């Protein structure tokens, strides 16, 4: 159910950027207030990313007011902050469907709107894409402008600086808006700095600046002196030296919640030549007190009543696999001070809050820099430490070369705790953990484990901790554990050995991971054997051979891409053993998995017990 737009009289007049640009500038502050209120209520109805969008309301209004979108290109890095953008670009009446099956995409998505010029979800991609679009715009000579909006968190990734280094060299016209919500230099925000930014972006200043460069071109000594003088004067009030060194003209920081100042500064900057940086200061969660006080806790929210000023109480229930990992990490750190926990900026999501507080000297947040996080683990392993890299499946993709070159090639004992393996759900195709078993299985020296429940998860983590012949990975899903009885004593499992969970006839289901419960349910109707394979690599050769010899049909089950996954490993083994056998592979299809609740996606892909049974019966009927 959508909100009554009559309660938002100015927002009602701005369903598209064209309509927004028809409004008098005097109405923009009221529009921003109404947009923030609409965002607050709509996310309360639907769930979704919350605090980031509250902080970019004024910026979104100003950008669409000054720039001729979608002709001018606007790219949002990551996309958590883009809900106001969606509201102002014709999707207002569908905001209550965001992140839901067949609803609006959780991030900017090219297939959804012409205003979404680049599909996003992972951080640090915006500057590279914007640079390419800026080069294309220059070739077209149509007067197109290009803007990228990136947060200070994403600025910790190396790809951003690679792109900025290239942009500074090419010197195409583009604007990078740095949305800084960490308040690290808040003393520079205010009327004086807003005024300074408008002066520095104004035509008189830039004309004098560029003319002076031409005059001084033939006098390098004086030119260098003038440059240093300018940098010194600017450096007294602005922290832009790094950007200037990379070839960008730096403006700011200015108040990112002053829509009039943003409009005037953006108008000035729109005509500037070369790469530009506008540094704005914002507050994550702006306008909603609980989110302002706890922006991390309010980063993403379930459905809630904004009038209650609190999120709904979490119902007591089973721990999540992330919490199971976090507790294990604390338990093992109590015993071994050489255990080091590494995360690429996912402390909360990976269950490492308690570990970071209890063992601060053993905790390393590498920021949004997955390549660095993986090689950091490799370096620690070289020095005899026990590094544990906690990382989401989708983000391990970003450190793949380091996994091969820096870890596996050297047989370094780095343990990878891979969270969000398999179906993630509402965050959609950019975040589904669909590929990790496939891209890790082909790497020599890797040991890969897939626990079927939380107790097995603990034992496998301990197995990886004890394994010193090379890297190991334990891959587990998002969400609640299964309720298995936890065995406190930790025992290293025999490498490459599975266990039979149910003896049946004719059909043997070889299960990898937490799909075991559904496989057991399906097996009841089929009277099938069920094996908890435990290890994706190395496979239990003897057990696979036994199942092939004693059953007519094998079924592999995994929550990973079928192509190259665990089932492919079973087929490769059977071929090597010269044991031809009908094999049905159940897993994720060769497509990017759309957003929806995990239950909906699992059902649609026939990965629940009902779907498995249907797939097996259809296979047997052929």
From Swiss-Prot:
Enzyme class, first EC level, given as a word: transferase
PROSITE patterns found in the cross-reference section: TRANSKETOLASE_1, TRANSKETOLASE_2
Pathway in which the depicted protein is active: Metabolic intermediate biosynthesis; 1-deoxy-D-xylulose 5-phosphate biosynthesis; 1-deoxy-D-xylulose 5-phosphate from D-glyceraldehyde 3-phosphate and pyruvate: step 1/1
Keywords associated with the record: Isoprene biosynthesis, Magnesium, Metal-binding, Thiamine biosynthesis, Thiamine pyrophosphate, Transferase
Binding site for Mg(2+): 152, 181
Cellular component annotations (GO), alphabetically ordered: cytosol
GO molecular function: 1-deoxy-D-xylulose-5-phosphate synthase activity; magnesium ion binding; thiamine pyrophosphate binding
InterPro entries: Dxylulose-5-P_synthase (IPR005477), THDP-binding (IPR029061), Transketo_C/PFOR_II (IPR009014), Transketolase-like_Pyr-bd (IPR005475), Transketolase_BS (IPR020826), Transketolase_C (IPR033248), Transketolase_CS (IPR049557)
Details of cofactor binding: Binds 1 Mg(2+) ion per subunit. Binds 1 thiamine pyrophosphate per subunit.
Catalyzed reaction equations: D-glyceraldehyde 3-phosphate + pyruvate + H(+) = 1-deoxy-D-xylulose 5-phosphate + CO2
Cofactor(s) needed for function: Mg(2+); thiamine diphosphate
EC numbers: 2.2.1.7
Residues reported to bind thiamine diphosphate: 80, 121-123, 153-154, 181, 288, 370
Disulfide cysteine pairs (residue numbers): none
GO biological process terms, semicolon-separated: 1-deoxy-D-xylulose 5-phosphate biosynthetic process; isopentenyl diphosphate biosynthetic process, methylerythritol 4-phosphate pathway; terpenoid biosynthetic process; thiamine biosynthetic process
Similarity-based family: Belongs to the transketolase family. DXPS subfamily.
Its biological purpose: Catalyzes the acyloin condensation reaction between C atoms 2 and 3 of pyruvate and glyceraldehyde 3-phosphate to yield 1-deoxy-D-xylulose-5-phosphate (DXP).
Assembly mode: Homodimer.
Listed name of the protein: 1-deoxy-D-xylulose-5-phosphate synthase
UniProt organism field: Shewanella sp. (strain MR-4)
This protein's encoding gene: dxs
């Amino acid at each position: 159910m959508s909100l009554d737009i009559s309660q938002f009289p100015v927002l009602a007049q701005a369903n598209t950027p064209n309509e927004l640009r028809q409004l008098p500038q005097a109405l923009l502050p009221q529009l921003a207030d109404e947009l923030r209120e609409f965002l607050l209520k709509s996310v309360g109805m639907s769930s979704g990313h919350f605090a980031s969008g509250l902080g970019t309301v004024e910026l979104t209004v100003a950008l669409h007011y000054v720039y001729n979108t979608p002709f001018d290109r606007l790219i949002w890095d990551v996309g958590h902050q883009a809900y106001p953008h969606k509201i102002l670009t014709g999707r207002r009446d569908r905001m209550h469907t965001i992140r839901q099956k067949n609803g609006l995409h959780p991030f900017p998505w090219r297939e959804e709107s012409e205003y979404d010029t680049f599909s996003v979800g992972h951080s640090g991609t915006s500057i590279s894409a914007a640079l390419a679009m800026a080069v294309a715009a220059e070739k077209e000579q149509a007067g197109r402008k290009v803007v990228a909006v990136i947060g200070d968190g994403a600025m910790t990734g190396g790809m951003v600086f690679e792109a900025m280094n290239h942009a500074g060299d090419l010197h195409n016209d583009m604007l990078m808006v740095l949305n800084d919500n960490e308040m690290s230099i808040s003393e520079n925000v205010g009327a004086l700095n807003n005024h300074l930014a408008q002066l520095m972006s104004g035509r008189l200043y830039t004309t004098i600046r560029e003319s002076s460069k031409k005059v001084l071109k033939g006098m390098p000594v004086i030119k260098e002196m003038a440059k240093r003088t300018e940098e010194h004067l600017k450096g007294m009030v602005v922290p832009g030296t790094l950007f200037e060194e990379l070839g960008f003209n730096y403006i700011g920081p200015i108040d990112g919640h002053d829509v009039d100042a943003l409009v005037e500064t953006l108008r000035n900057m729109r005509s500037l030549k070369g790469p530009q940086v506008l540094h704005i200061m914002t507050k994550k969660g702006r306008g909603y007190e609980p989110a302002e006080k706890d922006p991390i806790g309010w980063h993403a929210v379930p459905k809630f009543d904004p009038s209650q000023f609190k999120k709904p109480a979490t119902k007591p229930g089973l721990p999540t696999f992330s919490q199971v990992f976090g507790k294990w990490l604390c338990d093992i750190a109590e015993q071994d001070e050489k255990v080091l926990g590494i995360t690429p900026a996912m402390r909360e999501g990976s269950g490492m809050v308690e570990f970071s507080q209890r063992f601060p000297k053993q905790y390393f947040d590498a920021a949004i820099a997955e390549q660095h996080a993986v090689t950091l683990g490799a370096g620690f392993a070289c020095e005899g430490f026990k590094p544990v890299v906690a990382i989401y499946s989708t983000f391990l993709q970003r450190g793949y070369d380091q996994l091969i070159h820096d870890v596996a090639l050297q047989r370094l004992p780095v343990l990878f705790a891979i969270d969000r393996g398999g179906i993630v759900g509402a965050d959609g195709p950019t975040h589904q953990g669909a590929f990790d078993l496939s891209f890790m299985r082909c790497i020599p020296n890797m040991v890969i484990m897939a626990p079927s429940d939380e107790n097995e998860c603990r034992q496998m983590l301990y197995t990886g901790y004890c394994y010193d012949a090379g890297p190991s990975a334990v891959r587990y899903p998002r969400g609640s554990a299964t309720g298995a009885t936890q065995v406190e004593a930790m025992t290293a499992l025999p490498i490459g050995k599975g266990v039979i969970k149910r003896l049946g006839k004719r059909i043997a289901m070889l299960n990898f991971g937490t799909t075991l419960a559904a496989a057991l349910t399906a097996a009841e109707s089929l009277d099938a054997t069920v094996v908890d394979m435990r290890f994706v690599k190395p496979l239990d050769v003897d057990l696979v051979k036994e199942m092939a010899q004693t059953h007519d049909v094998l079924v592999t089950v995994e929550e990973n891409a079928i192509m190259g996954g665990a089932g492919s490993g079973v087929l490769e083994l059977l071929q090597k053993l010269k044991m031809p056998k009908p094999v049905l592979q159940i897993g994720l299809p060769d497509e990017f998995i759309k957003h929806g609740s995990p239950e909906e996606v699992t059902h649609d892909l026939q990965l629940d017990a009902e779907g498995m049974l249907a797939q097996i019966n259809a296979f047997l009927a052929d």
